[in-house]
Amino acid sequence: KQAKELGKNRYHIFDANEYSIDDSHRKAFIAANNMLHHALDNDQIIPFFQGIHDNKTNEITKFEVLARIKQDGKIITPYHFIEPAKLSGLLPDITQIMIDKSFKIMASNDFSFSVNITEDDLSRNYLNDFIALKLKEYQIQPSRVILEVLEGISSSGKKNHIKQLSALKNQGISLAIDDFGSEYSNFERILDLDIDFLKIDAKYIKNIDTDPKSFEIVRAI
């Protein structure tokens, strides 16, 4: 098969180690995919809330909602299930669970909180109606909700995606771009989307106190 892919009159030397690595990756993916489906079927996907501090007062002013799987007494991070979730088309299922569960929990306080959404969510075209339903169900003020999108979504400029994000903004929901600066940064697109928050990529932040270039980039942003 490898020789055919290389073209006519070509050959490929079989390397058992090469295929054992591929096989190991395949088995790991299958295991992760099975774990994810088990978590979905058994209501094991839960929200974790990471506090966001005000740099001046050091007080928590809002929370970021993070997806986790709680299984067999262990907490599993997205690193172990995000790839199979994307390849299996299950990211919107996870997003809906995060929205529902975080809204239910946050209904008991007045903090603002952010939830991550993906390009897959926008491709399904369900967010506007679903979030409106959950806002009403849990009596959450739209101004408390922040939706985080990756920079790639906003810079891709798909008209339908931008239309959906604008509709969410019209509900009173805030928008944030996550990991800004990790891809091609389109400032014009930020203006088009009327973004409320920019979460600058960590590579610019981690050395901001010692690296003049990082400082200047962040200051410019």
Model-derived features with residue positions:
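Catalytic-core segments of nucleotide cyclases and related cyclic-nucleotide turnover enzymes
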Residues: 1-8, 79, 180
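C-di-GMP signaling machinery
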Residues: 5-46, 56, 85-89, 121-124, ...
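Catalytic core of bacterial c-di-GMP phosphodiesterases, primarily the EAL and HD-GYP domains
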Residues: 11, 55, 59-64, 88-163
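A short, well-structured catalytic beta-strand-centered motif of the EAL phosphodiesterase domain
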Residues: 46-83, 196-198
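Signature for phosphate-centric chemistry
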Residues: 71, 81, 115, 179, ...
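Short acidic-capped amphipathic helix/loop micro-motif used as an active-site/signal-coupling element
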Residues: 71-75, 99-103, 179
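The catalytic core of metal-dependent phosphodiesterases that act on cyclic dinucleotides
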Residues: 134-208
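Alpha-helix-loop-beta-strand connector modules within alpha/beta enzyme cores
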Residues: 219-221
